[in-house]
Design a protein with these regions (language model features):
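Glycine-rich, N-terminal phosphate-binding loop and its surrounding beta-alpha-beta segment
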Residues: 44-104, 108
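Internal helix-turn-beta structural module
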Residues: 301-368
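Alpha-helical support elements that line or immediately flank enzyme active sites
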Residues: 21-33, 129-150, 223, 227-231, ...
Length: 368
Protein backbone atom coordinates (compact mmCIF):
# COMPACT_ATOMS: atom_id res chain seq x y z
CA UNK A 1 0.00 0.00 0.00
CA UNK A 2 1.45 3.34 -1.06
CA UNK A 3 0.62 6.63 0.61
CA UNK A 4 1.61 5.95 4.23
CA UNK A 5 4.46 8.50 4.31
CA UNK A 6 4.31 12.29 4.57
CA UNK A 7 6.88 15.09 4.53
CA UNK A 8 10.20 15.86 2.84
CA UNK A 9 12.82 16.25 5.59
CA UNK A 10 10.67 15.98 8.71
CA UNK A 11 9.07 12.80 7.39
CA UNK A 12 6.77 10.25 8.98
CA UNK A 13 5.64 6.78 7.94
CA UNK A 14 2.65 5.34 9.79
CA UNK A 15 1.53 1.73 10.16
CA UNK A 16 -1.09 -0.38 11.90
CA UNK A 17 -4.84 -1.01 11.84
CA UNK A 18 -7.77 -0.32 14.14
CA UNK A 19 -8.11 -3.98 15.18
CA UNK A 20 -4.52 -5.09 14.66
CA UNK A 21 -1.95 -5.41 17.43
CA UNK A 22 -1.13 -1.73 17.47
CA UNK A 23 -0.56 1.54 15.63
CA UNK A 24 2.85 3.10 15.15
CA UNK A 25 4.99 5.62 13.34
CA UNK A 26 8.60 6.15 12.30
CA UNK A 27 9.70 9.80 12.17
CA UNK A 28 12.80 10.76 10.17
CA UNK A 29 14.55 14.12 10.03
CA UNK A 30 14.09 15.28 13.62
CA UNK A 31 17.15 17.38 14.52
CA UNK A 32 19.41 15.97 17.21
CA UNK A 33 19.36 17.63 20.61
CA UNK A 34 15.61 18.18 21.03
CA UNK A 35 14.44 17.32 24.54
CA UNK A 36 11.82 14.59 24.19
CA UNK A 37 10.11 12.12 26.51
CA UNK A 38 7.18 9.75 26.30
CA UNK A 39 5.29 12.19 28.54
CA UNK A 40 5.65 14.86 25.84
CA UNK A 41 3.92 12.54 23.37
CA UNK A 42 1.35 11.21 25.85
CA UNK A 43 -0.03 14.68 26.58
CA UNK A 44 -1.34 14.95 23.02
CA UNK A 45 -2.45 11.31 22.73
CA UNK A 46 -4.55 11.76 25.87
CA UNK A 47 -6.41 14.60 24.17
CA UNK A 48 -7.25 12.28 21.25
CA UNK A 49 -8.05 9.00 23.01
CA UNK A 50 -11.59 7.55 23.05
CA UNK A 51 -14.06 7.00 25.87
CA UNK A 52 -13.59 10.31 27.68
CA UNK A 53 -17.18 11.60 27.48
CA UNK A 54 -20.61 10.66 26.19
CA UNK A 55 -19.91 12.15 22.77
CA UNK A 56 -17.12 9.70 21.94
CA UNK A 57 -16.95 5.98 21.23
CA UNK A 58 -17.15 3.76 24.31
CA UNK A 59 -14.01 1.92 23.20
CA UNK A 60 -11.61 2.09 26.16
CA UNK A 61 -7.95 2.48 25.23
CA UNK A 62 -5.11 3.81 27.37
CA UNK A 63 -3.25 4.76 24.17
CA UNK A 64 0.05 4.54 26.04
CA UNK A 65 2.99 5.40 23.80
CA UNK A 66 6.37 3.70 23.79
CA UNK A 67 9.39 5.33 22.17
CA UNK A 68 11.44 2.48 20.71
CA UNK A 69 14.32 4.39 19.13
CA UNK A 70 15.79 7.77 18.30
CA UNK A 71 16.33 9.20 21.80
CA UNK A 72 19.08 8.92 24.39
CA UNK A 73 19.21 10.47 27.84
CA UNK A 74 16.07 12.48 27.11
CA UNK A 75 17.17 14.01 23.81
CA UNK A 76 16.72 13.14 20.15
CA UNK A 77 19.78 11.62 18.49
CA UNK A 78 19.01 12.59 14.89
CA UNK A 79 18.22 8.96 14.01
CA UNK A 80 14.70 7.68 13.16
CA UNK A 81 12.27 7.90 16.06
CA UNK A 82 10.00 4.86 16.22
CA UNK A 83 6.89 4.88 18.42
CA UNK A 84 4.09 2.39 19.06
CA UNK A 85 0.71 2.35 20.82
CA UNK A 86 -0.71 -1.13 21.46
CA UNK A 87 -4.42 -1.78 20.91
CA UNK A 88 -6.19 -3.11 24.01
CA UNK A 89 -9.98 -2.99 23.56
CA UNK A 90 -10.78 -4.01 20.00
CA UNK A 91 -14.11 -5.89 19.64
CA UNK A 92 -13.72 -7.45 16.21
CA UNK A 93 -16.86 -9.57 16.64
CA UNK A 94 -18.92 -6.37 16.44
CA UNK A 95 -17.86 -6.12 12.80
CA UNK A 96 -18.44 -9.69 11.60
CA UNK A 97 -21.60 -8.75 9.68
CA UNK A 98 -19.79 -5.94 7.87
CA UNK A 99 -17.70 -8.44 5.91
CA UNK A 100 -20.74 -9.17 3.74
CA UNK A 101 -21.79 -5.62 2.81
CA UNK A 102 -20.54 -2.12 2.12
CA UNK A 103 -21.21 0.57 4.73
CA UNK A 104 -22.49 3.85 3.26
CA UNK A 105 -20.00 6.70 3.68
CA UNK A 106 -17.08 4.36 4.45
CA UNK A 107 -14.13 3.16 2.38
CA UNK A 108 -15.37 -0.46 2.25
CA UNK A 109 -16.35 -0.42 -1.42
CA UNK A 110 -13.38 1.64 -2.61
CA UNK A 111 -10.85 -0.57 -0.77
CA UNK A 112 -12.42 -3.63 -2.42
CA UNK A 113 -12.35 -1.90 -5.80
CA UNK A 114 -8.65 -1.02 -5.43
CA UNK A 115 -7.17 -4.00 -3.60
CA UNK A 116 -9.72 -6.78 -4.02
CA UNK A 117 -9.50 -7.13 -0.25
CA UNK A 118 -10.34 -5.11 2.85
CA UNK A 119 -9.93 -5.35 6.61
CA UNK A 120 -13.55 -4.93 7.67
CA UNK A 121 -12.71 -4.84 11.41
CA UNK A 122 -13.21 -1.20 12.23
CA UNK A 123 -12.05 0.00 8.84
CA UNK A 124 -8.42 -1.13 9.02
CA UNK A 125 -6.10 1.61 7.75
CA UNK A 126 -9.03 3.93 7.00
CA UNK A 127 -10.09 3.95 10.66
CA UNK A 128 -9.79 7.10 12.72
CA UNK A 129 -7.49 5.12 15.00
CA UNK A 130 -4.78 5.63 12.39
CA UNK A 131 -4.54 9.24 13.62
CA UNK A 132 -2.71 8.01 16.74
CA UNK A 133 0.44 7.86 14.61
CA UNK A 134 -0.12 11.38 13.28
CA UNK A 135 -0.57 12.77 16.77
CA UNK A 136 2.54 11.02 18.09
CA UNK A 137 4.63 12.45 15.25
CA UNK A 138 2.93 15.83 15.49
CA UNK A 139 3.78 16.05 19.18
CA UNK A 140 7.46 16.01 18.21
CA UNK A 141 6.86 18.70 15.59
CA UNK A 142 5.05 20.83 18.17
CA UNK A 143 7.97 20.43 20.57
CA UNK A 144 10.38 21.59 17.87
CA UNK A 145 8.19 24.57 16.97
CA UNK A 146 7.98 25.60 20.62
CA UNK A 147 11.78 25.88 20.64
CA UNK A 148 11.34 28.57 17.98
CA UNK A 149 8.53 30.37 19.81
CA UNK A 150 5.88 29.15 17.35
CA UNK A 151 2.54 27.97 18.77
CA UNK A 152 -0.23 25.97 17.10
CA UNK A 153 -3.70 26.03 18.66
CA UNK A 154 -6.90 24.46 17.35
CA UNK A 155 -10.49 24.41 18.59
CA UNK A 156 -13.99 23.50 17.46
CA UNK A 157 -15.47 26.40 15.51
CA UNK A 158 -18.82 24.80 14.74
CA UNK A 159 -20.87 21.65 15.23
CA UNK A 160 -23.74 21.17 12.83
CA UNK A 161 -25.34 24.60 12.47
CA UNK A 162 -24.08 25.79 15.88
CA UNK A 163 -21.12 28.17 15.47
CA UNK A 164 -19.12 29.98 18.14
CA UNK A 165 -20.06 33.64 18.66
CA UNK A 166 -17.30 34.53 21.13
CA UNK A 167 -13.80 33.34 21.95
CA UNK A 168 -12.44 32.42 25.39
CA UNK A 169 -9.32 30.24 25.18
CA UNK A 170 -9.82 29.05 28.77
CA UNK A 171 -13.25 27.68 27.89
CA UNK A 172 -11.85 25.21 25.32
CA UNK A 173 -10.75 22.80 28.06
CA UNK A 174 -13.93 23.32 30.07
CA UNK A 175 -16.30 21.46 27.76
CA UNK A 176 -16.28 18.09 26.02
CA UNK A 177 -16.52 19.63 22.56
CA UNK A 178 -13.41 21.86 22.72
CA UNK A 179 -15.40 24.99 21.90
CA UNK A 180 -14.14 28.42 23.09
CA UNK A 181 -17.72 29.60 23.62
CA UNK A 182 -19.64 28.12 26.59
CA UNK A 183 -23.05 29.03 25.20
CA UNK A 184 -22.29 27.50 21.81
CA UNK A 185 -20.94 24.37 23.51
CA UNK A 186 -24.21 23.96 25.40
CA UNK A 187 -26.28 24.35 22.23
CA UNK A 188 -24.02 21.91 20.38
CA UNK A 189 -24.39 19.38 23.20
CA UNK A 190 -28.17 19.59 22.85
CA UNK A 191 -27.87 19.10 19.09
CA UNK A 192 -25.67 16.03 19.57
CA UNK A 193 -27.94 14.56 22.22
CA UNK A 194 -30.87 14.86 19.80
CA UNK A 195 -28.87 13.28 16.97
CA UNK A 196 -27.83 10.35 19.18
CA UNK A 197 -31.44 9.76 20.22
CA UNK A 198 -32.33 9.60 16.53
CA UNK A 199 -29.42 7.17 15.86
CA UNK A 200 -27.74 9.84 13.78
CA UNK A 201 -24.48 11.84 13.74
CA UNK A 202 -23.23 15.39 13.12
CA UNK A 203 -20.26 17.08 11.44
CA UNK A 204 -18.49 20.37 12.08
CA UNK A 205 -15.47 22.62 11.59
CA UNK A 206 -12.11 22.78 13.38
CA UNK A 207 -10.17 26.04 13.19
CA UNK A 208 -6.41 26.19 13.76
CA UNK A 209 -4.31 29.31 14.37
CA UNK A 210 -0.51 29.48 14.21
CA UNK A 211 1.13 32.32 16.15
CA UNK A 212 4.65 33.75 15.62
CA UNK A 213 5.35 32.03 12.32
CA UNK A 214 8.15 33.99 10.63
CA UNK A 215 7.73 35.36 7.13
CA UNK A 216 9.42 33.49 4.30
CA UNK A 217 8.48 29.87 5.02
CA UNK A 218 7.11 27.76 2.17
CA UNK A 219 7.91 27.49 -1.52
CA UNK A 220 6.08 28.73 -4.62
CA UNK A 221 4.34 26.61 -7.25
CA UNK A 222 3.97 22.95 -6.17
CA UNK A 223 5.25 23.23 -2.59
CA UNK A 224 3.15 26.15 -1.43
CA UNK A 225 2.67 26.25 2.32
CA UNK A 226 -1.10 26.55 2.00
CA UNK A 227 -1.23 23.73 -0.56
CA UNK A 228 0.69 21.42 1.78
CA UNK A 229 -1.50 22.41 4.73
CA UNK A 230 -4.58 21.62 2.64
CA UNK A 231 -3.19 18.21 1.66
CA UNK A 232 -2.26 17.43 5.25
CA UNK A 233 -5.71 18.28 6.58
CA UNK A 234 -7.70 16.62 3.80
CA UNK A 235 -5.66 13.46 4.43
CA UNK A 236 -7.34 13.21 7.85
CA UNK A 237 -10.27 10.79 7.62
CA UNK A 238 -13.68 12.56 7.45
CA UNK A 239 -12.26 15.93 6.31
CA UNK A 240 -14.11 17.09 3.18
CA UNK A 241 -12.88 20.66 2.81
CA UNK A 242 -10.24 23.18 3.90
CA UNK A 243 -10.21 26.96 4.05
CA UNK A 244 -7.21 29.28 4.44
CA UNK A 245 -7.83 32.74 5.88
CA UNK A 246 -11.21 34.04 4.75
CA UNK A 247 -11.60 30.97 2.55
CA UNK A 248 -14.53 30.81 0.17
CA UNK A 249 -15.94 34.13 1.39
CA UNK A 250 -13.28 35.89 -0.72
CA UNK A 251 -15.16 34.71 -3.79
CA UNK A 252 -17.80 37.38 -3.15
CA UNK A 253 -15.31 40.04 -2.01
CA UNK A 254 -13.59 42.65 -4.19
CA UNK A 255 -9.89 43.21 -4.63
CA UNK A 256 -9.99 46.28 -2.40
CA UNK A 257 -11.89 44.55 0.41
CA UNK A 258 -9.84 41.35 0.23
CA UNK A 259 -6.33 42.82 -0.04
CA UNK A 260 -4.39 43.13 3.22
CA UNK A 261 -2.69 46.53 3.42
CA UNK A 262 0.95 46.60 4.57
CA UNK A 263 2.27 48.97 7.24
CA UNK A 264 5.70 49.75 8.69
CA UNK A 265 5.83 50.14 12.46
CA UNK A 266 8.05 52.65 14.23
CA UNK A 267 10.56 49.88 14.94
CA UNK A 268 10.82 49.09 11.24
CA UNK A 269 8.83 45.85 11.37
CA UNK A 270 6.44 45.13 8.51
CA UNK A 271 2.88 44.12 9.39
CA UNK A 272 -0.47 43.73 7.66
CA UNK A 273 -3.43 45.78 8.85
CA UNK A 274 -5.83 42.88 8.17
CA UNK A 275 -5.37 39.15 7.61
CA UNK A 276 -7.85 38.00 4.98
CA UNK A 277 -5.08 35.89 3.42
CA UNK A 278 -4.66 33.85 6.59
CA UNK A 279 -0.94 34.46 6.93
CA UNK A 280 0.15 33.08 3.55
CA UNK A 281 0.81 34.94 0.28
CA UNK A 282 2.08 33.21 -2.86
CA UNK A 283 2.43 29.98 -0.91
CA UNK A 284 4.87 31.61 1.55
CA UNK A 285 4.20 32.72 5.13
CA UNK A 286 3.93 36.51 5.54
CA UNK A 287 4.55 36.76 9.29
CA UNK A 288 0.88 37.10 10.25
CA UNK A 289 -1.08 34.44 12.10
CA UNK A 290 -1.74 31.43 9.88
CA UNK A 291 -5.45 30.57 10.00
CA UNK A 292 -6.82 27.31 8.57
CA UNK A 293 -10.13 25.49 8.93
CA UNK A 294 -10.99 21.84 8.28
CA UNK A 295 -14.56 20.74 7.61
CA UNK A 296 -15.52 17.28 8.93
CA UNK A 297 -18.40 15.22 7.60
CA UNK A 298 -20.85 13.53 10.00
CA UNK A 299 -19.66 10.14 11.27
CA UNK A 300 -20.90 7.61 8.66
CA UNK A 301 -21.42 4.81 11.21
CA UNK A 302 -24.96 5.45 12.40
CA UNK A 303 -27.35 2.96 14.02
CA UNK A 304 -30.40 4.01 11.99
CA UNK A 305 -31.47 1.91 9.00
CA UNK A 306 -29.58 2.65 5.76
CA UNK A 307 -29.76 1.31 2.22
CA UNK A 308 -26.73 -0.42 0.71
CA UNK A 309 -25.69 -3.56 -1.19
CA UNK A 310 -24.03 -6.79 -0.15
CA UNK A 311 -21.10 -8.42 -1.92
CA UNK A 312 -23.54 -10.56 -3.92
CA UNK A 313 -24.90 -7.40 -5.53
CA UNK A 314 -28.23 -7.43 -3.68
CA UNK A 315 -29.95 -4.33 -2.32
CA UNK A 316 -30.31 -4.57 1.46
CA UNK A 317 -31.06 -2.45 4.53
CA UNK A 318 -28.58 -2.38 7.43
CA UNK A 319 -28.28 -1.04 10.96
CA UNK A 320 -24.60 -0.66 11.88
CA UNK A 321 -23.57 -2.12 15.22
CA UNK A 322 -20.43 -1.42 17.25
CA UNK A 323 -18.97 1.49 19.21
CA UNK A 324 -18.78 4.69 17.20
CA UNK A 325 -18.39 8.44 17.76
CA UNK A 326 -21.57 10.45 17.14
CA UNK A 327 -19.15 13.20 16.08
CA UNK A 328 -15.41 13.16 15.39
CA UNK A 329 -14.81 16.92 15.48
CA UNK A 330 -13.89 17.32 19.16
CA UNK A 331 -11.35 14.47 19.13
CA UNK A 332 -10.00 15.69 15.79
CA UNK A 333 -8.95 19.08 17.20
CA UNK A 334 -5.58 17.74 18.34
CA UNK A 335 -5.16 15.86 15.04
CA UNK A 336 -5.56 19.13 13.12
CA UNK A 337 -3.00 20.76 15.43
CA UNK A 338 -0.52 17.96 14.86
CA UNK A 339 -0.89 17.78 11.08
CA UNK A 340 -0.48 21.55 10.88
CA UNK A 341 2.66 21.33 13.03
CA UNK A 342 4.11 18.57 10.84
CA UNK A 343 3.75 20.72 7.72
CA UNK A 344 5.33 23.74 9.42
CA UNK A 345 8.25 21.79 10.90
CA UNK A 346 9.02 20.26 7.52
CA UNK A 347 8.74 23.60 5.72
CA UNK A 348 11.09 25.26 8.20
CA UNK A 349 13.73 22.58 7.70
CA UNK A 350 13.36 22.62 3.91
CA UNK A 351 13.56 26.41 3.90
CA UNK A 352 16.95 26.49 5.61
CA UNK A 353 18.63 25.97 2.23
CA UNK A 354 16.76 28.79 0.47
CA UNK A 355 19.47 31.42 1.12
CA UNK A 356 23.24 31.19 0.90
CA UNK A 357 23.45 33.19 4.13
CA UNK A 358 21.63 30.38 5.93
CA UNK A 359 24.09 27.81 4.63
CA UNK A 360 27.05 30.00 5.61
CA UNK A 361 25.77 30.37 9.17
CA UNK A 362 26.05 26.61 9.62
CA UNK A 363 28.94 25.57 7.39
CA UNK A 364 31.25 28.52 6.64
CA UNK A 365 34.76 28.22 8.07
CA UNK A 366 35.63 30.67 10.81
CA UNK A 367 37.76 33.35 9.13
CA UNK A 368 39.31 34.52 12.39
Amino acid sequence: MAGSSFGTIFRLTTWGESHGKGVGVVVDGVPAGLSLSEEDIQFYLDRRKPGQNRFTTKRKESDTVQILSGTFEGKTTGTPISMVVWNEDQHSKDYSDIASYYRPGHADYTFDAKYGFRDYRGGGRSSGRETIARVAAGAIALKMLSELGITVSAYTRSIGDVEIQSFDAVEIANNALNMPDAEAAEKASELLTKAMAEKNSVGGVVECVVHHMPAGVGDPVFEKLDANLAKALVSIGAVKGVEIGDGFSVCIATGLTNNDAFHVNADGSIVKLTNHAGGILGGISDGSDIVVRAGFKPTPSVAASQQTINKDGENIAIEIKGRHDPIVVARAVVVVECMTALVLADALLVGMSAKLDNVKKVWALDEK
